[in-house]
Design a protein with these regions (language model features):
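S-adenosyl-L-methionine
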Residues: 4-188
């Protein structure tokens, strides 16, 4: 379950020969969308849907349906903020009370273009989620385990762990505050 950013753990061979092979088996998506940023989610979930940014260096699949902007003026952060709010999650459950999301479910949602979303809030949620995701060994941007990043001024592993726990707790509280603020936009 990854909201805002994450679940990027597949590496796809993307050479010309590999793309030719995928195309010969019907497994290649429309090249118009290659290298484009979008909003994606997992088609099958165990609870609520979690929408997240798909960066331009990531591909999409039928198991990760993706919304792409029609033109450069379309705001993907707005789309992401709307889809991740609790009110829309409830609407999606009413539209399709199952563990699978379909493109038609998203298209059945009302138009929320008048919602006054704070892009900086969504940007911060993505930033925090991306940093969290990249702390996992399955992330292709993973560099080191935070617990083992002792600095010379840290007196003991115990103190370093306490410090990390405080950082993690504060990050969790910030995420919670920002998500609640995003939800309030639709409640008010």
């Amino acid at each position: 379950f990854r909201r805002w950013y994450g679940n990027n753990h597949r590496v796809v061979k993307w050479t010309t020969g590999a793309r030719d092979e995928y195309a010969s088996h019907g497994g290649l998506h429309n090249s118009v969308f290659w290298g484009k940023t979008g909003v994606t989610c997992s088609k099958i979930t165990s609870s609520t849907n979690a929408f997240r940014i798909k960066e331009n260096n990531q591909e999409y699949s039928s198991l990760a349906p993706t919304i792409f902007p029609i033109n450069t003026d379309d705001n993907l952060y707005r789309v992401l903020g709307v889809l991740n709010c609790k009110a829309v999650q409830q609407l999606l459950w009413v539209i399709n009370p199952s563990l699978t999301i379909n493109v038609g479910d998203i298209l059945a949602l009302p138009n929320f273009s008048d919602a006054q979303l704070d892009e900086s809030l969504i940007s911060r949620l993505i930033e925090i989620s991306k940093a969290d995701w990249n702390n996992y060994e399955i992330s292709y941007a993973f560099t080191y385990i935070q617990l083992f990043s002792l600095r010379s001024n840290d007196s003991a592993l115990k103190d370093h762990y306490r410090s990390l726990r405080t950082i993690w707790r504060n990050t969790t509280l910030e995420m919670q505050r920002l998500e609640e603020k995003n939800n309030r936009i639709f409640i008010e």
